[in-house]
Amino acid sequence: MRNVVLAVHGGAGSLPRGSISAEQERAYRDGLTRALRTGYALINEGRPSLDAVEAAVRVLEDDPNFNAGKGAVFNTDGEQELDASIMNGRDLRSGAVAGVHNTKNPISLARMVMERSRHVLMAGRGADIFALQNGVPYTTQDYFFTQRRWDALIAAKNPPAGGAEQTTGETVGAVAVDRNRDIAAATSTGGLTNKLVGRVGDSPIIGAGTYADNRTVAISCTGTGEVFIRGVAAHDISALMDYTGASVTRAAARVITEKIPALGATGGAIALDPRGVLATPHSTAGLINAYILRDGTVVTRIFDDETPAR
């Protein structure tokens, strides 16, 4: 796709047409559209891409349909541990948080880490305290409870005989390019249903789940986090573009549909270059994603047949 200003994703996985109600379909599409409209309005005001990706991800964090913020999954102890990261392609500044319990919008805390500390990554209780000190909305764990996620935890703890442990996708992310052709990326997640306490995936790891460099591309990944970390997936896409001259489409496809599966995992990504060319490769059956063009046209894609494997 070309002339894309902002793109978001709601996780890689499989969502066949007919597998959800019409009401749930509308909820997914409406959530993605709200995120796009919110970020697009900022870019139209002349604001930087960094503002747009933060705002878009905040909308998705506030939406219980996605595995981030309000809709985050439960760990094995029945709690939420939230991860997020954000990166500015203009100067490679970045911020990230992992394992936070009481921060309503982890993506905004990640930006605070970038702008108000000398660090890149903060974790756990210290990150939650930093949120309080910097005015990031603070909440109790009760805020994150949803019956759907609780039911998923119970199912994961009691799988059918011979069944595989259940995992949940729906990690969220955003990539954007502004009027100055500065690009940015952001990712936020609750991780895996029934994950061990303290587990951290790729979403808050700069270079694994999130990366942005004005010379190449802005990327937000989703999938099996442990393998995306091992494969340094997001940075690898950028490196292929930088060192070999590969297009965003070719570089992203090579990493997401060739390298990551060769390591034994699946997933997807949204990757946007400074010219507004968007790639959405995935090795899963589908990738929930949406984008908005310069003229304001919105496209949402949630079902597998709308996002054929690439």
Feature map (PLM): residue ranges:
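Alpha/propeptide regions of enzymes that mature by internal proteolysis
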Residues: 1-310
